[in-house]
């Protein structure tokens, strides 16, 4: 449709370049990927510049930062898609709930990336179960097998803050573990 990717932001420039390359490889020579050099924002306040440049915001940052990025987006009347989890602690959860209420009052759309909830195979399976295709379910177990979570090795001269931000999955201040 009439959607164009116009800006990206990250605390680290190499992450923008790697992500942009992946998007371009996935979508090919798509004209709707229109991120000029001036719209590649780097730094701790980069999210503000990217949000200011857009109509709809996609928040895929480490979840420890997400409540504050969400707050900025809603306060600036932006529609938001954000990945799960939406926060990492009670303070962040309260912030997200508060901003979700404001978003609703402003009639802004907010969607959380619960990918399996929207995947057609899962939706079809749920319908079949609800319609009794396998009878009454008395119990069940679900497993999710994966190769594991990435680890970025510490680089020489890297600060503790940068190391933790690049390995956010393993640190409670920016993760959900």
Where are these regions (language model features)?
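Conserved PLP phosphate-binding loop immediately N-terminal to the Schiff-base lysine helix
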Residues: 89-91, 120
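Hydrophobic residues in well-ordered beta-strands that form the structural core
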Residues: 59, 82, 88, 110-112
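Predominantly a Rossmann-like dinucleotide-binding segment in NAD(P)-dependent oxidoreductases
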Residues: 106-111, 116-176
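Extracytoplasmic "Venus flytrap"/periplasmic binding protein-like
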Residues: 77-79, 132-133
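N-terminal glycine-/serine-/threonine-rich beta1-alpha1-beta2 phosphate-ribose binding loop
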Residues: 1-78, 91-107
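Proline- and acidic/polar-enriched loop/turn elements at helix boundaries
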Residues: 10, 63, 85-86, 93, ...
